[in-house]
Curated annotation (Swiss-Prot):
Organismal lineage: Bacteria, Bacillati, Bacillota, Bacilli, Bacillales
Domain of life: Bacteria
Family named by the database record: Belongs to the UPF0435 family.
InterPro entries per the UniProt record, alphabetical: UPF0435 (IPR009507)
One Pfam family cited in the UniProt record for this chain: DUF1128
Protein name: UPF0435 protein ABC2298
Annotated source species: Shouchella clausii (strain KSM-K16) (Alkalihalobacillus clausii)
Length: 74
């Protein structure tokens, strides 16, 4: 299981927000990402950054995935 710093999480989230042109950038913040979800964040970031473009439905799914990264800190 990966362990990311808040700075690393913030960078990944910023990368994805820019690529996806997220309007509500406050949807997820680095300190709201559950440590248990760091591997999921890494995988989602890799997927978003390697894809040249996304359909509206794909963007909706990605935003939903981002929302699922939130959780209690353990």
């Amino acid at each position: 299981m990966a362990s990311l710093t808040l700075e690393e999480i913030e960078t990944m989230l910023d990368d994805m927000k820019k690529k996806l042109n997220v309007v509500n950038a406050s949807v997820i913040t680095s300190d709201s990402v559950s440590p248990a979800k760091h591997d999921d964040l890494i995988a989602l970031h890799a997927h978003v950054m390697r894809s040249p473009s996304f359909s509206i439905s794909e963007m909706d799914e990605i935003v939903q995935e981002l929302g699922q990264l939130r959780g209690r800190k353990s």
